[in-house]
Amino acid sequence: MIDPLAALVPVVVEQTSRGERSFDIFSRLLRERIVFVTGEVEDNMASLIVAQLLFLESENPKKDIYMYINSPGGVVTAGMAIHDTMQYIRPRVGTVCIGQAASMGSFLLAAGEPGMRVALTNARVMVHQPSGGARGMASDIEIQAKEILRIRKRMNDLYVKYTGKSLKDIEKAMDRDTFLEADEAKEFGIVDHVYDRRPALPGDDAPRDVSEGPTP
């Protein structure tokens, strides 16, 4: 099925020694080592993200990658495929929340390289425990319930690792939908910085983390 929105993706034209080359905007940004995690996290999308991460590692295993996240979450196993690839490859993967990072989206945001996890000023983050429906015979429902509990424990342990919070605090936050504004996500340990504009280049004024309040 053809995505009707694909025709709306801008094309960037560049001049080279061999003439003009055109890229869709996402392919051009991939050259700058920028990866987008947008929309629902599911298997097809996860495969594309994993492929991009592996490609960028093969291009330069020492150069950082930046992952921009605007996602309501999705399938746990698909998210874990992205998460495990982020940890597996050699380049550091910084994460940036634009819009929202909910459920599995917030998990991927927290899994970024420490010190390189960012939320923009009006971004929102939501954490909660994994959920799933169970149907069939009682024994099958019991098996599925045990699997969900096992996944919840694993994710809680990883949130403890990434946020520095105690397991008790994580379990309390994950028990129901917990919504966080950008500065609250920083306090929780999901991100390290909250920016309203891109950090300065060498020679510019120092970048300011807006979650630290106004400067004098």
UniProtKB/Swiss-Prot annotation:
Active site residues of this protein: 103, 128
CDD domains attached to this UniProt entry: S14_ClpP_2
Organism expressing this protein natively: Sphingopyxis alaskensis (strain DSM 13593 / LMG 18877 / RB2256) (Sphingomonas alaskensis)
Superkingdom to which the source organism belongs: Bacteria
Pfam families associated with the record: CLP_protease (PF00574)
Family per similarity comment: Belongs to the peptidase S14 family.
One BP annotation, GO: protein quality control for misfolded or incompletely synthesized proteins
Assembly notes: Fourteen ClpP subunits assemble into 2 heptameric rings which stack back to back to give a disk-like structure with a central cavity, resembling the structure of eukaryotic proteasomes.
Cellular component terms (Gene Ontology): cytoplasm; endopeptidase Clp complex
Molecular function as annotated in GO: ATP-dependent peptidase activity; ATPase binding; serine-type endopeptidase activity
Protein name listed in UniProt: ATP-dependent Clp protease proteolytic subunit
EC number(s) recorded for this UniProt protein: 3.4.21.92
Protein's job: Cleaves peptides in various proteins in a process that requires ATP hydrolysis. Has a chymotrypsin-like activity. Plays a major role in the degradation of misfolded proteins.
Keyword Protease: yes
Alphabetical UniProt keywords: Cytoplasm, Hydrolase, Protease, Serine protease
Catalytic class of the enzyme: hydrolase
Secretion signal span: none
Recorded catalytic activity of this chain's protein: Hydrolysis of proteins to small peptides in the presence of ATP and magnesium. alpha-casein is the usual test substrate. In the absence of ATP, only oligopeptides shorter than five residues are hydrolyzed (such as succinyl-Leu-Tyr-|-NHMec, and Leu-Tyr-Leu-|-Tyr-Trp, in which cleavage of the -Tyr-|-Leu- and -Tyr-|-Trp bonds also occurs)
